[in-house]
């Protein structure tokens, strides 16, 4: 909205052109989402409590989690409301990438909402079945990937960018583009969902990765920076930094209430959606491999579950005390805050390594 106002009001006074600057709108979007998130926090938390939308704690989980019983869940509503409002205010709504990301956000939020609702109604950890979630996620992913491929205006939008190599861009067929995109989008969504098991564990890595993807989006949207880094120039990608800024603001605002000991949990409406958001942005920017490096913590959490299941079904033995791996460290006696902060640190290091690939070519 403000971008449009800047365009209109510049005819009256050139000073209003500042509303069109990406940097100004990114800062504005970040601060707006942060303020909305912090101010709405108590209201949404009280609403969730009044509706008895409370976290169910599994009896076979770590005993330290019993004290979390009764903590309101579905706090992802706080993240998504502040994120969406801020994006609509500060982003260029004529940019098709913004609408793709918002569409994915809404679609995965609906899946997460119904999953949370069923868990609350049943008072168990069983919401939608795994197959139901995969089917719904696949439908949204298929629509998104198909649109991205056939709406592409330049070759790099549908190509595979190989890290560490200059100008190594591999064209992709419709099938490969859509299939790999669906894999990344669904995988990212479920990876963040698996990671969201401790207070603040998932939200700060999401914020940090979102910020890093925003920098890549800005670089690829700027011809001079893209040429300097030997990146393909995607003229529309720069606008995604405004969305990433709103993601940072809403995420930090949520962390204010989600930090240990948490006053609210994001629920599947938050974790499934945030993972999908990161995935779709990485796909649009054609930096799926770089994203995999950044999201190493999410990847390891997912692999730990896969390894545990495969090992138990084939050998009858468990590799970890409990999966995902953050529960393994809990059962080894690590304090919850120590696990959380160390995973944050690992994420920060991985992001720095991933960003280094932009120049090491």
Go through each PLM region and give its residues.
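Membrane-interface helix-loop junction between the first two transmembrane segments
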Residues: 42-60
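Membrane interface segments of multi-pass transport proteins and intramembrane proteases
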Residues: 119-129, 163-172
């Amino acid at each position: 909205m403000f971008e449009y106002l800047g365009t209109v009001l510049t005819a009256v006074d050139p000073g209003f052109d500042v509303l069109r600057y990406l940097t100004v709108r990114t800062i504005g979007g970040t601060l707006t989402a942060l303020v909305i998130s912090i101010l709405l926090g108590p209201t949404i938390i009280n609403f969730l409590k009044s509706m008895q939308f409370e976290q169910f704690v599994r009896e076979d989980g770590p005993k330290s989690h019993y004290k979390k019983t009764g903590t309101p869940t579905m706090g992802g509503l706080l993240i998504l409301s502040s994120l969406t409002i801020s994006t609509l205010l500060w982003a260029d709504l004529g940019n098709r990438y913004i609408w793709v990301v918002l569409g994915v956000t809404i679609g995965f939020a609906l899946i997460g909402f119904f999953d949370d609702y069923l868990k609350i109604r049943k008072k168990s950890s069983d919401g939608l079945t795994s197959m139901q979630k995969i089917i719904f996620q696949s439908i949204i992913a298929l629509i998104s990937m198909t649109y991205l491929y056939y709406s592409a205006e330049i070759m790099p939008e549908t190509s595979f960018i190989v890290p560490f190599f200059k100008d190594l861009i591999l064209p992709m067929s419709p099938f490969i583009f859509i299939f790999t995109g669906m894999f990344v989008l669904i995988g990212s969504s479920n990876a963040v969902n698996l990671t969201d098991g401790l207070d603040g564990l998932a939200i700060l890595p999401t914020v940090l990765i979102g910020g890093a993807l925003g920098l890549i989006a800005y670089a690829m949207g700027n011809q001079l920076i893209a040429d300097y880094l030997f990146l393909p120039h995607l003229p529309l990608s720069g606008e995604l930094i405004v969305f990433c800024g709103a993601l940072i603001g809403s995420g930090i605002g949520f962390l204010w209430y989600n930090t240990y000991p948490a006053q609210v949990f994001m629920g599947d409406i938050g974790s499934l959606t945030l993972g999908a958001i990161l995935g779709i942005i990485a796909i649009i920017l054609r930096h799926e491999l770089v994203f995999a490096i950044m999201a190493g913590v999410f990847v390891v959490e997912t692999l730990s579950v896969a390894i545990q299941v495969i090992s138990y079904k084939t050998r009858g033995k468990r590799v970890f005390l409990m999966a995902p791996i953050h529960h393994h460290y809990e059962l080894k006696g690590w304090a919850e805050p120590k696990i959380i902060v160390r995973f944050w640190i690992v994420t920060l290091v991985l992001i720095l390594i991933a960003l280094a690939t932009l120049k090491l070519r």
